[in-house]
């Protein structure tokens, strides 16, 4: 549990996620501001259905991605690599996520894009501030944590 707490604290301080989808052998990546839900271990994003990545995702799809800072030295590198699933939210689930998203990013109130959830199933957190190449791994299904 400590690994997930450490990762969640770091993710809560960031705000841009990159994720990639695949359809029929074609890959595409996208970036978006996110709201991280530590309880569900999920990102919430807004993206229009007409975008290439949303079209490739359909109502849900497997994804992989990253969240990282932009440090000037290797010793300060910190970042997450993940795999999981993206899905478009509907109804009350969408309304609740949008309310929380709009609270974090008030400018989003002007947007009508649908809300999507990226559920994280595996996370690898690299934190060179704890020593070069220091990794922490969290897996949803097994509850496994490695430091």
UniProtKB/Swiss-Prot annotation:
Source superkingdom: Bacteria
Gene3D superfamilies found in the cross-reference section: Electron Transport, Fmn-binding Protein, Chain A (2.30.110.10)
InterPro entries: Split_barrel_FMN-bd (IPR012349), UPF0306 (IPR011194)
TM region(s), chain numbering: none
Family: Belongs to the UPF0306 family.
Protein name (Swiss-Prot/TrEMBL): UPF0306 protein YhbP
């Amino acid at each position: 549990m400590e690994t997930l707490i450490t990762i969640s604290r770091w993710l809560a301080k960031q705000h841009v996620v990159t994720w990639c989808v695949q359809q029929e052998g074609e890959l595409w990546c996208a970036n978006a501001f996110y709201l991280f839900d530590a309880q569900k271990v999920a990102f919430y994003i807004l993206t229009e259905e007409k975008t290439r990545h949303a079209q490739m995702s359909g109502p849900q799809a497997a994804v992989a991605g990253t969240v990282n800072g932009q440090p000037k030295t290797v010793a300060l590198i910190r970042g997450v690599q993940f795999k999981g699933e993206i899905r478009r939210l509907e109804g009350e689930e969408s309304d609740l996520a949008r309310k929380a998203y709009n609270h974090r990013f008030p400018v989003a109130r002007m947007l009508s894009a649908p809300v999507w959830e990226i559920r994280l199933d595996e996370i690898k957190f690299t934190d060179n501030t704890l020593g070069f190449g220091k990794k922490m791994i969290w897996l949803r299904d097994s509850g496994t944590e490695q430091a």
